[in-house]
Every structure is written in structure tokens, then in C-alpha cells.
Amino acid sequence: MSNSNNDSRRRGLEMERRAADWLASHGLRLVDANQHARRGEIDLIMRDGDTLVFIEVRHRRDARHGHPFETVTAAKQRRLIGAARFYLHRNGLSCACRFDVVGVTGTPPHLSFEWIRSAFDAF
């Protein structure tokens, strides 16, 4: 893997960690992170009460190239849904679920977080 890919992956993991901390400060509890399935990857899996929340974290340094939410396309949503179904099946879970998206803008330590609960429907 090239250095730029390693740097991008490292930055992505850092933003996911920061988003998990931010969401925890808003009452969610981390269950799992970076879950891979054949159809995609789930950045964060958290609990909001009895609801299992699959969370996509998107980061942009600034809005010059669009808002982070704009990168969650219909194709990306389908991959997330497939990965979530695999996760539920693999873990024998049957519970209320939702898909959230967290947009992170800026560079540390000046980050702005935006959170869309129930960003799209799946089940």
C-alpha cells in the first residue's frame, strides 16, 4: 500500500475515533468498529438505547469539494446495508436498527461534527 493510501487510512481511522468519542458524549455506546463484509465496511456500530446504529463517518477538510454528506451515494448506502445485514446474520442479532451518518469538517483540533440520525432506510 502506498504512503498516501496509508496516510488516508490513518486519517480516516482518526476521524472515526473522534466521531465515536463525540457520539458517546451524546449518549451512544460503542459496540464495534471497522467491520468488514464482502459488500462493504461499517465504520462504527453503536447502541442508542435498544437500537443498534450503523454509522458512516465522512470527513472533509473544508467544503470546497462538497459537504461530507454528499459522498454517501445510493451505491454506498446499498453497500452499507449489505454489510449491516451480514453483521446481523453473523452475530445472530434481531433488533431495531438504523443508519446514521456523521459528517466531520476541519482539521484537528478544529473539527465540526454534524449528525444525521436515520439518514436512510434499509429494513
UniProtKB/Swiss-Prot annotation:
Pfam families documented for this protein:
UPF0102
In terms of InterPro entries, this protein maps to: Restrct_endonuc-II-like (IPR011335), tRNA_endonuc-like_dom_sf (IPR011856), UPF0102_YraN-like (IPR003509)
Give a GO molecular function annotation for the protein. nucleic acid binding
The record's SUPFAM superfamilies line, in alphabetical order, gives: Restriction endonuclease-like
The family note in this entry says: Belongs to the UPF0102 family.
| Name this protein carries in UniProt | UPF0102 protein Csal_2201
